[in-house]
């Protein structure tokens, strides 16, 4: 995969500017791209003056979070944590652009490499030395009690159906492939992709799914019932959550920042997304190694198969 070789190649740089060291990393990335003849456009919140006044970043085009931000862009480069990546993915998904994450945060499960390898990552981008991995998404539709569509959205990680005020119990019925599974009270129901299985669904007791697996994960969150185990269903399945007519108003929250109101008696339908995310990969390190590294899992004493050559990734923390 390469960035299209036209004269006005351009990368949308999406930095988390909350820390001085992050701004310095963004400036470095912008300079490296510019020196390689790649145009730079910087995404910044409207209230953020850090970029505009920065001696390096202030020289580049600045845009806000809108569909226009990705016009004439070839790739989205994210510098930050998982939250920054998910917001950048919102733009990349709408424009069908590849997205690359460099972790400047703590865990950074969605990032490809760590900040210490930023210069090499940018070099790979400018040379086209990367491949694209298609990551599954979810399409979300909300219908009122009369069956009228009242909202649609999508998620890369998960959609969480939960009480709007988070102070009561969500009374709901879970449905798989147009058949009822169970009715119960809970804090919420999480429907996740394999990519999102290490996020909110994992914290709620769900299993980790390897990202190359095609499946949909359903995790009841703090449910008050006997049968509330996580479910792994076919990627072709439809998952629905019906709110009880006398229930409190609820909300379908997608990736933690996009939301749709779910009134009493409403229905939330979740299916495999019609468009995947184009995930930039810079190496072939197994997901198992990423999992161990990110979660700092203890593996002392492991010897491994005979004659196995260990894989070492110098670009991951």
Curated annotation (Swiss-Prot):
Disulfide bonds: none annotated. NAD(+) binds at residues 82-83, 87, 157-158, 187, 198-203. Pfam families: NAD_kinase, NAD_kinase_C. Its cofactor is a divalent metal cation. GO terms for molecular function: ATP binding; metal ion binding; NAD binding; NAD+ kinase activity. The active site is at residue 82. It is found in: Cytoplasm. This is NAD kinase.
């Amino acid at each position: 995969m390469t960035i299209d070789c036209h004269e006005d190649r351009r990368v949308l740089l999406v930095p988390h500017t909350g820390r001085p060291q992050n701004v310095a990393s963004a400036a470095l990335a912008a300079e490296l791209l510019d020196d390689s003849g790649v145009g730079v456009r910087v995404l910044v919140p409207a209230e953020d003056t850090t970029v505009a006044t920065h001696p390096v970043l202030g020289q580049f085009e600045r845009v806000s979070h809108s569909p226009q931000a990705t016009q004439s862009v070839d790739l989205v480069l994210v510098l930050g944590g998982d939250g920054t990546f998910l917001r950048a993915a919102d733009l990349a998904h709408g424009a069908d652009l590849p997205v690359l994450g460099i972790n400047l945060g703590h865990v950074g499960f969605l990032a490809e490499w760590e900040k210490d390898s930023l210069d090499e990552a940018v070099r790979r981008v400018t040379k086209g030395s990367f491949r694209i991995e298609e990551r599954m998404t979810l399409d979300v539709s909300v219908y009122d009690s009369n069956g009228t569509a009242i909202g649609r959205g999508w998620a890369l990680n998960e959609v969480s159906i939960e009480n709007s005020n988070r102070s009561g119990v969500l009374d709901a019925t879970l449905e798989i492939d147009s058949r009822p599974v169970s009715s119960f009270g809970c804090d919420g129901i999480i429907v996740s992709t394999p990519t999102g299985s290490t996020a909110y669904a994992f914290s709620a007791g769900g299993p980790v799914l390897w990202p190359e697996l095609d499946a949909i994960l359903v995790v009841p969150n703090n449910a008050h019932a006997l049968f509330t185990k996580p479910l792994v269903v076919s990627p072709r399945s439809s998952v629905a959550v019906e709110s009880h007519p006398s229930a409190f108003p609820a909300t379908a929250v997608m990736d933690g920042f996009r939301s749709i109101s779910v009134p009493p008696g409403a229905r939330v339908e979740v299916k495999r997304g019609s468009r995947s995310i184009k995930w930039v990969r810079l190496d072939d390190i197994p997901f198992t190694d990423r999992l161990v590294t990110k979660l700092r899992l203890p593996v002392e004493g492991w010897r491994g198969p005979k004659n196995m050559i260990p894989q070492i990734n110098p670009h991951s923390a």
